[in-house]
Amino acid sequence: MNNISRYLIILFLTVVAPFGLAAQNNALLERLYDTFANNCIALDCTYSIVSDAVPVKGQCEIEFQGTSYKMKGGGLEIFCDGASVWIMDADVMEAVIEPVSDESQTYMSNPALLFRDMDQMFSVSGSSAAGAAMRYRLSAQKPCGVRTAVLDIDKNAVLQKAEFMMDNDCVIRIDVKSVTVLPKKENSAFAPGKISSAWVVTDLR
C-alpha cells in the first residue's frame, strides 16, 4: 500500500475509534464516535500532506464499518473485509492482496489493528471552541504512527476537519466535504468481488 493511502486509512480509523472519554465537554466527540461505531459511514474529503518532500494534495472517498473499509483516492482503490486487504491500481491492472493478521504487523501497516486498539492508544488532551465548532486535541499513549491529532466537530457532532502529526513529522490536513450515514452491510460488501484474469494479482495471504 503506498504511504499516502496508508496514512489516509489510518487517520480515518483514528477518528472513529473510542478514546476513553470522561469529561462532559467531550460530548460531541462521544456523539461522533457513537454514530460512526454503529453505522456504515461514507466520507468525501480533500487532503494535503506536508513533509520534507513536495506537498501532496488530493481527494478521496472512504466508506467504513468496524474494521472493514473501502477507499478510492491517490490513484488506488483499497478494500478490507476485516480478514484481507486488496490494493488495486486500475491504471496498470495490478492488485496486491495482504492478510489482516496480528503477527509481525505494525499499526502503520495494518490499520485494522489500530482501530481495534485505539481506546488504549489515544487520550483526549484538551478541547476548546473553534468558531462554531469544538476542537479536540488527542495524544498518542503508545507508538502507533500518529503522534497527535486535532479534530474539529460541529454542534451536530459532524466532523469538519482534522489535522494529524505523524511520527515522521509529516503533517496531514483533511477537510470533510460530506458525511453520509448508511445502513450496515455484510463484510462481503467490502471486498472487490471476482478480479478479472487480465489483472496481475500478487496474493500474499
What spans do the regions from the language model cover?
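An acidic-aromatic
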Residues: 61-108, 172
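One face of beta-strands
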Residues: 41-47, 58-62, 67-71, 147, ...
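Bacterial N-terminal signal peptides
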Residues: 9-18
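Non-transmembrane domains of secretory- and envelope-associated proteins
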Residues: 130, 141-148, 155-205
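N-terminal leader/targeting segments and the immediate start of mature chains
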Residues: 19-55, 67, 193-205
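Bacterial N-terminal signal peptides that target proteins for export
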Residues: 1-9
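Flexible, surface-exposed loop/linker segments and immediately adjacent secondary-structure boundaries
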Residues: 100-131
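Short beta-strand segments that buttress and anchor functional surface loops
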Residues: 45-49, 70-74, 135-142, 161-165
